[in-house]
Amino acid sequence: MWLPLPLLLGLLQLQPILSYQIDWNKLERINRGKVESCGGUQLNRLKEVKGFVTEDLPLYHNLEMKHIPGADPELVLITSRYEELERIPLSDMKRDEINQLLKDLGFYRKSSPDAPVPAEFKMAPARASGDTKEDL
């Protein structure tokens, strides 16, 4: 069986995001996140990730940047007690894939860095007990 070239290329573009499967049982206590990365050397070679870090990350509520010299870019998911739940490597992801992952995880994206966060999203991405991805 063969696939048409456009479909095959489309599937290949989805590969990085499909390589990380969200385990909702493990991440049910997610409350916030941070992106850890070096400030220059790694990011300058990763244009998509650098675009996300410099332009998109400031728009997300409960998501912060932490510069660590020499560190590969990772999304670190954290509980309300600052316990680490998961580390997701970002180096192989495209900017839109990182944004989609954050959306899937329930992070709220503001229209501008200074925009207010609606009351219902103040605790995002935290979910009430029993909420599922479909409830987001």
Swiss-Prot record:
Keywords from the named record: Endoplasmic reticulum, Selenocysteine, Signal
Location(s), subcellular: Endoplasmic reticulum
Cross-referenced Gene3D superfamilies: Sep15/SelM thioredoxin-like domain, active-site redox motif
InterPro entries: Sep15/SelM_sf, Sep15_SelM, Sep15_SelM_dom, Thioredoxin-like_sf
Site of covalent link Cysteinyl-selenocysteine (Cys-Sec): C38-U41
GO annotation, cellular component aspect: endoplasmic reticulum lumen
Active site: C38 (nucleophile), U41 (nucleophile)
Chain ranges for the short sequence motif Prevents secretion from ER as given in the UniProt record: 133-136
N-terminal signal peptide: 1-19
Gene Ontology molecular function: oxidoreductase activity
Residue segments, region Disordered: 111-136
A Pfam family per the record: Sep15_SelM
Keyword Ribosomal protein among record annotations: no
Known role: May function as a thiol-disulfide oxidoreductase that participates in disulfide bond formation.
Family note: Belongs to the selenoprotein M/F family.
Protein name as catalogued: Selenoprotein M
Gene: selenom
